[in-house]
């Protein structure tokens, strides 16, 4: 058995990209599947990753709001997507609003530049074996 850790993530939305970038940064080899551009949902229009439906989808930044608190926790944990969002933010009062196309392009570039991430466009093949879960070795 190889000592190289590998995982597969299905979907290059916000959560899939954040997870892939974080795991790859920890040395895990990631295969990231994204169905676009072969298949689009009714809400999506471009082939990029982390495509937001609304420019203010990232919501409020106040720490007394759930979305603001979540973003602060993500910052403290080393989020890759929040700096990307902040780089393409647009004025929206107390919300973190972004230029959606620029944000998607920036996240797509981050993911594609990460050497531990292999992007597969299209739907993943059906699994022929049961899912395996990895747990760290006991101390």
Stretch-by-stretch model annotation:
Residues 2, 25-27, 114, 129:
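Short, well-ordered coil/turn elements that cap or connect secondary structure elements
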Residues 5-31:
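N-terminal Rossmann-like FAD-binding beta1-loop-alpha1 element of flavoenzymes
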Residues 6-7, 57-58, 94-95:
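Short, contiguous strand/loop micro-motifs
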Residues 15, 19, 70, 103-107:
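General structural feature for long, well-ordered alpha-helical segments within catalytic domains
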Residues 21-83:
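N-terminal FAD cofactor-binding segment of flavoenzymes
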Residues 73-139:
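Feature captures the FAD/FMN-dependent oxidoreductase FAD-binding
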